[in-house]
Amino acid sequence: MKIGIINTKIRTVFSAFACMIAASLVCTMPARAVVEININKGVIEPLPIAITDFLSADQLGSNITSVIAADLERSGLFAPIDTGAFIEKISNPDAAPRFEDWKVINAQALVTGRITKQPDGRLKAEFRLWDTFGGQQMIGQQFFTTPDNWRRVAHIIADAIYERLTGDKGYFDTRVVFVDESGPAQKRVKRLAIMDQDGANVRFISDGRALSLTPRFSPNRQEVTYMSFEGGSPKVYLLQLETGQRELVGNFPGMTIAPRFSPDGQKVVMSLLQDDGSANIYTMDLRNRTTTRLTSSQAIDTGASYSPDGSQIVFTSDRGGRPQLYVMGADGSNPRRISMGDGSYSTPVWSPRGDLIAFTKQSQGQFSIGVMKTDGSGERLLTSGFHNEGPTWAPNGRVLMFFRKAAGAGGPKLFTIDLTGRNERQIQTPNFASDPAWSPLLE
């Protein structure tokens, strides 16, 4: 089956992730900027930031500004100031602003920029980030792209601002693969879809004729592995996003579920359901198609997720009576239980930073999204309700996306939440949505 929908070779659109910093934009970086956000302090007050409309010959500059502001505001770390409060109107984004005018409205940082169309039809996007109270430019960069990729420029600029002010990589220039759900509950159509992390640019990558679940990105963002009921029983497939070509991952005699890539993209880990009702974890080496069995139990072992360095795997098992989280070596050695709380645990996923494991917990009639340290200590529940499930990490390990279904009629919706549990946002999608998986940063 070929689905020629998505061209993922976006990296060729940009000139060196920015033709990074032309001579006219180079600035001396101070050893320590006056304005910064310490995101390791826990709950913090959002930083007031003024983002002026990028100068352009049409509406595009304003559109780019809106996306940048929305990205930063949604992170919970920034509070974009209403443009109606601006005193100075920026007419030359290359010139130093009147810092006093921005200090009056308590703008801790200021963003100015310009969009121009080049003779070859490309867009040139320039921006500068200013420390208003320090009275200095913090960064200045320029990017070239085709007009249809203007949203990517906005996300990349937002990432640059986020990184300069927090010291952490941003996560805005990313995508999410998920399950789109449409139609009545009794005849729900579930299709695989891909979108920008903010819900824009949704594209379908399966036709919905067969139930498809648990899509997961490869580390290079070019492939998705997922489970499909085509043929009647669940099997794991590999889909090439650029060509739409797909293939069966291992022609196992039983049902295969819950696939996920290894960090180097060379293996897929999954669970194989046995005739006796048990499930064990296997890996398939995508280079030579050899399979390795990692667990051998009479329990249900599933939901495997690698540590960022590929040395360990966290998974769910009911070998102790109810589903709990276990960690083992990537070769299946030394399995040990790490979850010790009441209730049942599932859908574990290791943080890209390596410090935490996110999970779904069912206890006292509620489903919660939580995190714990990799040894099981420090468990924290970030959000609880009727049904919350399926966390996935932003590539910087600071934000989670999950799906929620409210009691009663309706269907699941996607939400993000940060590690404080205080900044929860819904991601708008065309239909109901579930099973999200975040991509690495695009290139």
Swiss-Prot record:
Keyword Transmembrane attached: no
Main location group: periplasm
Swiss-Prot/TrEMBL keywords: Cell cycle, Cell division, Periplasm, Signal
Residues forming coiled coils: none
An example Gene Ontology biological process: protein import
Annotated signal sequence range: 1-33
Gene Ontology annotations for the cellular component aspect, listed alphabetically: periplasmic space
Family affiliation: Belongs to the TolB family.
Quaternary organization: The Tol-Pal system is composed of five core proteins: the inner membrane proteins TolA, TolQ and TolR, the periplasmic protein TolB and the outer membrane protein Pal. They form a network linking the inner and outer membranes and the peptidoglycan layer.
NCBIfam families per record: propeller_TolB
Entry protein name: Tol-Pal system protein TolB
Gene it is expressed from: tolB
